[in-house]
Amino acid sequence: MIIFPAVDIKGGQAVRLRQGKADQETVFSGDPVAMARHWEEQGGRWLHVIDLDGAFSGTPVNRELIRTICASVSIPVQLGGGIRDTVTAQAYLDAGVERLIIGTIALTDPDLFGAMCSAFPGRIGVSLDAEGGRLKTKGWVEDSGLSIYDVLPRLTEQGAAFLIYTDIDRDGMQSGVNVEALSELAVRSAIPVIAAGGVATMQDVYDLYPVSRSANLQGAITGKAIYEGSLDLAEAMRWIDSRTA
């Protein structure tokens, strides 16, 4: 199981949003590159980077900063935010990003999402963000009217390489993960699942680890918890390694 430390970029700073709301942000660092290096030093095996400016504007905003992050760490980077065409996808892959996270267009433009999966096999994943069980789009602003199980068969057929499932109700709230919902999804999904939203303490790591052993759960993303100290990334990675050695 992989714990993905998150670096969310807004206005050139590393921030966290509460339940994805642009007006409810906490700035954790004025230097996202230093933060990326820090999480690698703490034992991170992957880095989860989101261009929040891009997510809200629909176009890449922090491309040069992201290129610098990729060049500054030796661990792979997965990136989301504002990637809504193949040209942008290619540019980020050329900049050193290992794999890309597609959100809105996976739901609103299935043909384009399928084309991206075909063009960059194994490197395109999807982020599905749910509130009250319903998928949201465009930076969690619009309700798609769909559930995750409405779209899962198509995403599987199109070749999505991984699936990030965010529980908006719990994101940034440090209220713990929804183990039941994640377990069901990891069992039903042929696509590796990554949990996001609510990962707050070692107890969440303990709760998710058995799911990763018995079902298709690849890991979990954590942000606010590792910045504020309720979860120690190095401790979490040591614990996981001790179970899988």
Curated annotation (Swiss-Prot):
A molecular-function term among this protein's GO annotations: 1-(5-phosphoribosyl)-5-[(5-phosphoribosylamino)methylideneamino]imidazole-4-carboxamide isomerase activity
UniProt keyword annotation of Isomerase present: yes
EC number(s) stated in the UniProt entry for this protein: 5.3.1.16
Chief localization: cytoplasm
Localization, UniProt: Cytoplasm
Gene Ontology CC annotations of this record: cytoplasm
Top-level taxon of the source organism: Bacteria
Enzyme class label: isomerase
Active site: 8, 129
Keywords associated with the record: Amino-acid biosynthesis, Cytoplasm, Histidine biosynthesis, Isomerase
Biological-process GO terms, alphabetical: L-histidine biosynthetic process; L-tryptophan biosynthetic process
Pathway of action: Amino-acid biosynthesis; L-histidine biosynthesis; L-histidine from 5-phospho-alpha-D-ribose 1-diphosphate: step 4/9
Reaction equations catalysed: 1-(5-phospho-beta-D-ribosyl)-5-[(5-phospho-beta-D-ribosylamino)methylideneamino]imidazole-4-carboxamide = 5-[(5-phospho-1-deoxy-D-ribulos-1-ylimino)methylamino]-1-(5-phospho-beta-D-ribosyl)imidazole-4-carboxamide
HAMAP family in alphabetical order: HisA
Record family assignment: Belongs to the HisA/HisF family.
PANTHER family: 1-(5-PHOSPHORIBOSYL)-5-[(5-PHOSPHORIBOSYLAMINO)METHYLIDENEAMINO] IMIDAZOLE-4-CARBOXAMIDE ISOMERASE
Protein name: 1-(5-phosphoribosyl)-5-[(5-phosphoribosylamino)methylideneamino] imidazole-4-carboxamide isomerase
Species this protein is from: Oleidesulfovibrio alaskensis (strain ATCC BAA-1058 / DSM 17464 / G20)
Gene: hisA
